[in-house]
Amino acid sequence: MNNFVITVDGPSGVGKGTLSAALANKLGFALLDSGAIYRISALAALRQGIAFDDEDELAKLIPTLAIEFISNNDEVTAILNGENVTTQIRSAEAGQNASKIAIFPKVRAALLQRQRDFSSPMGLIADGRDMGTIVFPDAQVKFFLEASAEERTKRRVKQLQEKGFNANFGEILAEIKTRDLRDRTRAVVPLVPAKDALLLDSTHLSIEEVISQALAHIAKFKKF
């Protein structure tokens, strides 16, 4: 792999998206939001009436979708077939649906090469859960972000409320813990850090502090 790739992995709510968008803007790199691809695919399946347990039909659907990401400051706009679906894919339900389809090998296979195709001569920030272990195992720089379930719940509640969604702390905390258990124990590509990833715990750090630590680490591998 000749193109410079930086992977940012970790569970939901740790700040992967914000860090990835910030790094893409500061470094002038392209951006891949892997989690959004799964959410977009689940949304498309829902709209077309495809069941979330129909592995074959889900795998057939994915290659037909036109997906792109537009990074603006610390925000990422997700586009599906020319439509801005950012708001639709950020709901709690969309996240649950994405985890449901992510367990299927054929679905992951259908998306794997597509994600690798995001690699760019300008450089790439790849945000996801298995970017450093499966999608870009040879990436030059790898991060794995962590944060407590309680802190992630606080962030998620605030995010949902700011977007106009109802949010219950207890329900979201339970959902996060359930997703964590499912993602870490699933048979196909469980959520684990790459062996050569730098672990960043953002529980008690501001996003500015996380970005600063990430940039300092990246500078060890690439001069800008």
Curated annotation (Swiss-Prot):
Its main location: cytoplasm. Keywords: ATP-binding, Cytoplasm, Kinase, Nucleotide-binding, Transferase. Coiled coil: none annotated. Transmembrane segments: none annotated. It is found in: Cytoplasm. NCBIfam families: cmk (TIGR00017). This is Cytidylate kinase. It comes from Haemophilus ducreyi (strain 35000HP / ATCC 700724). The lineage of its organism: Bacteria, Pseudomonadati, Pseudomonadota, Gammaproteobacteria, Pasteurellales. The gene is cmk.
